[in-house]
Amino acid sequence: MQLFITVVSLCMIVTAQSLLLRHSPRRATSIFMSSSSGAAVALSKNNLVIIIAGPTGVGKSDVAAKICAKHQGMIVSADSVQAYRGVQIGANKPTLAERAETPHLLVDMVDASEQYNAADWRRDALSCMELLLNKNPVCIEQGNCNPKLDQLNKDIADARHLKGYDAEARLRPVVVGGTMMYLQWLVHGRPDATRPTEQAIQKAQEDIERFQGQEADGWEKAIEYVSSLNPIFEDRVQTLSGRDWYRLRRTMEIAYSVLDQDDPTLLESLYSGERQGGLESFGYDVRCFFLCPSDRMKHTAVVDQRCEEMILRGLLQETTDLKVSNNLPDMATKAIGYRQALEYLQRSDAKTGDADAFDAFLNDFSTATRRYAKKQMQWFRKDGTFAFVPVLLKSSKADRVDATAKMIHDMCQLSRQDYEEALLPEDAAGNVPVSYQARLANNEQGKKMKLYQFKRYKLEKGSKEFESMLEQADECMVRLKEHQEQKTAPAEKRPRLL
């Protein structure tokens, strides 16, 4: 098995191309073969939507940009932090130059003060697809139009003009990101639980507070009460562990919402495990790809180096500026990078010149990012709808971007049946498709990651770069402390604004 995995890691790209040749003898010209007129080669499938996921640092944006450039496509960002205006370094947001070269939708969509969740993003992503493919938005027929529809329409119209695309041309939606919940909601649909009504939310909160006020046996009485509403909810609450008031309240909200509507079919569909409204239910030909690093050790080193680069580019300065100006979104405070920066800068025992604390912050940031990349790989290995596309890290950046984009293109040219067969552990001829080989290799390499040796590249303790960043960190810490003191000072002691 170990020998097999090693061979797979070295030969994935060649094997993938030969497998696709066998599957698609009549496939269209490669995206990297220019037509005689020099025009972009258009994909033949009118309703094709491409989804590109992958762990942080694997090169998703570069691959997506290559595909968009050849197919008159636009990137639909699936990143929970990039949707907010103001954030940049900590969100790894594309630069203005990159966005001019490849239009990005759902970036800079909302202000820091707004709440923007998976349901909001899914709604906006679906609207983007309809507008890019020149479909009449479903919401117009249903009378529940997206409140951001006008903004999305304008963003797409501006991007068409910038790129010189015809106003009526159907553009290719290329959804790119690593936020797992967002992609799950988009591809597989919303969870089976009903969205609670405002009345149900208020009633549940009042009832929870009443039970919480009953000292010793409040939890038991609350469980008994919810169980009495319906056997479905009894089964649900019996699985709760500890005194999980949050999940109990959520169950109450769903119960009140469903029972108030007096519709037995709603009860039947609750907690069925089935998700409603996946992309395919809208008539799209959805092709999902996970960019899988061929060498996890090398990829993890790339992640560590990327964390250092973010610090050197000014992550601490950006975090401080956003916090002081009250423009740091609540979502960002929980995101890797911003969260560690705030914890470090606002620590209770803070003092200037503390090299050990700064060194610990660097370690915490890198460790959290590595763990997130690992979680992304674990998550998508369990999702059989994503084709694992090996990214050969030993190649130059340009070569691996070209090879990865070409493989995605070729898989999009397969018939639906051949594409789905390429996702299976074994095809009709008894061969192990490349996607499954990549899954196996990724999982096998994960068993050896305990041997990974963390190293610094520029921010070694005592280095010139380390000392420079420590000085910047001290300045940020002082600014945040002064900001906090000003906020908590009595009104008469606060400086007057002229």
Regions found by a protein language model. Name each.
Residues 32-498:
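Phosphate/pyrophosphate-binding catalytic cores of soluble transferases and nucleic-acid-acting enzymes
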Residues 6-7, 13, 27, 40, ...:
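Detector for intrinsically disordered, low-structure N-terminal pre-sequences
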Residues 4, 19, 25-28, 144, ...:
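Compositionally biased, intrinsically disordered low-complexity segments enriched
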Residues 1-42:
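N-terminal chloroplast transit peptides
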